[in-house]
Amino acid sequence: MKQFKKLFFVIFLISVSIGTSNAQQGFKKYRYYSIGGCLNAMNYIGDLDPGPSFLSPSIKFTRYNFGVTGLYRIQPRVSLRGTISYGRIKGDDAVSADYENKNVYRLYRNLSFRNQIYEVKFDVVIDLFANARRYTKRPDYTPYMFIGLAYFHHNPQGQTPEGDWVNLKDLHTEGQGLPGGPKNYSRNQLALPIGLGFRYKLSKQWDLAFDMGWRFTLTDYLDDVAGVYYDKQALTDHYGDMSRIMSDRLYEEYVANPEFAASVDNAFGAPQPYYPGQPVQNDGWNHTSTYGQQGGQRGDLKGRRDLYLVTGFHLTYIFPGKVVCPKFR
């Protein structure tokens, strides 16, 4: 991932320098604005759905995304773009993993989430083919790349055993803010948008583009899963019983699904009481191997951040520039 971003940044710098050298003379009068809408698909890549790779996420949880976008052409192949969008992402261990693959341990973890993302993005768009004349003379098609900065607001939610959706951040499911636990995470975050696209000239003033952009975020909590399990009694004492329930979902499925229970028993043996000397109960006060046990791995401990992918179409309208009339003597 780091190598990909470095390579993209080098290409970006080279493209900007080329665009700048080509635009030194006379392009200012050809600058123009465009505005439009976008309709996209949105995918999540993280602890609950890592996908084959960050370039090829799983499509099982594809959700919608839509927004408005504006573009200002400043050089023959360079534009500044701003986009406001809304979309959803989703992940579920029970769907993204199964009994036969290497991710069976995520199946046992049995966590899930959904998240709504409100994003404001600014990026630099670099066209492969330059146009140093009026917008009407632009190429019929051109590939492009973009890189920028995004600010987004998110709110991961989980579904309770009763079917209600609750805000996971409010439940501090990994002991955020408690002694020995991680810091509270913010619902407001930054991301680095990087992507590629292809633009087609529909008419003199209309363009249709398709692009794919990865959002490399600075948080590992798009899914509310990042570190280790916290003490269940402490979660209950500070944030209520729902905090404990949403933190560890293994035994919930163990009780309801005989196939799941048999697989867990075969892998780890029967569940053990959460506190030594107590009986095993059917309400989650137990643990299986390290699942649910304080300090046991709950998320990716390698420090990898969550990301999301936005793929879709942009339809934009170009505002005509000023008409310059010839002077008569």
Regions found by a protein language model. Name each.
Residues R31, T62-Y64, Q116-V120, Y141, ...:
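Residues that define the transmembrane beta-barrel architecture of outer-membrane proteins
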Residues G37-A41, V68-Y72, F122-L128, I147-Y151, ...:
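Residues on the lipid-exposed face of transmembrane beta-strands in outer-membrane beta-barrel proteins
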Residues I45, R77-L80, N131-R133, Q205-L208, ...:
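Repeated loop/turn-to-beta-strand initiation elements of outer-membrane beta-barrel proteins
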Residues G51-P57, Y105-F113, A132-R133, L178-N184, ...:
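Extracellular loop and loop/strand-boundary signature of outer-membrane beta-barrel proteins
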Residues P76-V78, I84-K169:
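Gram-negative (and chloroplast) outer-membrane scaffold detector with strong preference
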Residues K121, V125, R304-R329:
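Outer-membrane beta-barrel "beta-signal"
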